[in-house]
Amino acid sequence: MLARAPGLTADHVRALFAATGEESSLCDSAQLLREMRVPAAARNFLASPDESALSADLRWIESSGTTVISCLDAAYPPLLAQTDGAPPVLFVLGSVEALGSTQLAVVGSRNPTASGRGNARDFAAALARSGLTITSGLALGVDAASHRGALDVGGITIAVMGTGLDTVYPAAHAELAACIRAQGALISEFPPRTAPAGCNFPRRNRIISGLSCGTLVVEATCRSGSLITARLAAEQGREVFAIPGSIRSPQSRGCHKLIREGATLVESLADVLSELQIPLPKQGVRSSMRPRPTEVAMDKGYEMLLDALGFEPATLDELIERTGLSSESVASMLLILELDGCVAALPGGRYDRITNDDRQRSRHPDLRI
């Protein structure tokens, strides 16, 4: 019932419960609801609920195995509970426990470049291997790549939906949604039979940021909805991270805008983990599903890049000149080699090769800067 009351928030429900001691009194406390400035539409619905809609909701919830969590339940996500306008109810398919895990939102363009898509997947995989749950919005582009990156390494991922849980949007992501449910959770504040609508997605975004200790924007235009998520994260007192890109790419301008406004510039996994005060993962932890270059046999392109790097630090431009590869290819390969522990990012935009002896001792100290 609470999910269908327009404009009702967790703050309203908690305040009323504190005043009366009864969750059920919501329907019988018209005066209190007015005093708490609950919207008239919500008051009217609570006074005269649509019983047929509620019965249909209940039937679907029971048949689908959905868990319903109210803001009064211990299972309600603690970080989300701290935010203004948090939803009074969450519908969950999958692991309820995942909602209480340490989460990082990874978001960005629905139409990313190949480099942006690769960065989303690789960063999500590395962050998941570091113990973070990857939270995103199941949208095309960066969202989907982020979910897949976490799934690749057996990590936990949460999809916050802008529809009811009975409607996967976009429909092409039905299989991805099933994988997320099996390895994490699908959640929504919207009751069953809620169709996709433009006004739903900014509301979804506040939950994505509210669940998370920080938000990483991988790639975004200046009009991207992911900038809404970043703004909400900042307003909620959470960290905001952004990956820079080409000055000529419209898909990078949103990230550059965030960096100018104070977002943490991200070039490596360590940039995120150090800001969140999370230790770097131990060397040798890798995906069992997505092979990295050092596993079994290294692709010739990676061998050429490592040969070009040698054992003296070099800049990206120097490596492009030595290999003859495109800037996007070299940047993507360096990221993968860095995540695999073969290369270290140094101050000043330089890269250094890590030897087997280095790996046995520890990660390169500059990774911790």
Features from the language model and the residues they span:
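Glycine-biased, small-residue-rich flexible motifs in mid-sequence functional cores and linkers
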Residues: G7, E62-I369
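N-terminal positively charged helical leader segments and presequences
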Residues: M1-G85
